[in-house]
Regions:
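Conserved beta-strand signature within the Rossmann-like core of class I S-adenosyl-L-methionine
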Residues: 67-69, 96-104
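Conserved Class I S-adenosyl-L-methionine
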Residues: 110-135
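Glycine-rich phosphate-binding "P-loop"
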Residues: 69-81
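S-adenosyl-L-methionine
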Residues: 10-60
Length: 217
């Protein structure tokens, strides 16, 4: 699912970019740009161009993915793809043993995924990104937490992260008809936060000595 062809179009015209890839990969990129799909005797893939909220309905519910990666702009910049309604549709196509992965550590996103029945884990920060307490989120439908091993790059949410899900930051983005504008989605959430009795996010930050820079969307 992708709304904008321009990045791929630009990349295919950029010789420096193309030199980074094997000719076979370049062929796949070109086919996805011109035909929206690629297939040979070993591999096939496709891309649905347009508003993801509309295009996701094209994917049959019978198709289940082992891996779903959410790489949209942050919830504040592009809330349309982080709403409880859209994520509900996304998770319907997740294999029961599959993984949903995103760079986002947003409390709203994590709480939504948990409310949709997924187990939530945090991606351990790399050394170079130590100022951030998480590099993202892994969500799994069925996973025995007791099987987590030290060499995994994800782990249970810390107490600090769990408490983040009890603040106003965890209030979800909503888009009931999957056609709302960015501004409308954000406004509705702000209104809901205003009247919520949940702990303020500032209080949570103060308790844990956090700054806005260390809290990723």
């Amino acid at each position: 699912l992708e709304i904008d062809k321009k990045p791929l179009e630009y990349s295919l015209r950029n010789e420096s970019f193309l030199k980074l890839w094997d000719p076979k990969v370049k062929k796949i990129f070109e086919s996805l740009y011109r035909k929206d799909y690629f297939e040979d005797q070993f591999f096939k893939c496709s891309i649905l161009w347009g508003d993801a909220r509309e295009k996701i309905n094209i994917i049959p519910s019978s198709i289940k993915f082992d891996l779903i990666y959410l790489d949209g702009f942050s919830p504040q910049k592009c809330p349309q793809v982080w709403t409880i309604e859209f994520l509900s549709k996304v998770t319907e196509n997740l294999n029961p043993q599959g993984y949903l992965i995103t760079y986002s550590s947003s409390a709203a996103v994590r709480k939504t995924l948990r409310n949709l029945g997924l187990e939530i884990f945090t991606i351990k920060p790399s050394f170079k990104n130590r100022p951030f307490w998480s590099q993202g989120t892994v969500a799994i439908s069925k996973f025995d937490k007791n099987k987590l091993k030290p060499n995994f790059n994800f782990e249970k949410l810390s107490l600090m992260e769990e408490e983040h899900l009890l603040t106003k930051a965890s209030i979800p983005y909503r888009d009931q008809d999957l056609n709302s504008s960015k501004d409308d989605i954000i406004r509705r959430r702000l209104d809901e936060q205003l009247f919520s009795n949940l702990l303020s996010t500032n209080k949570w930050r103060e308790k844990w000595g956090m700054t806005k820079l260390s809290v990723k969307s």
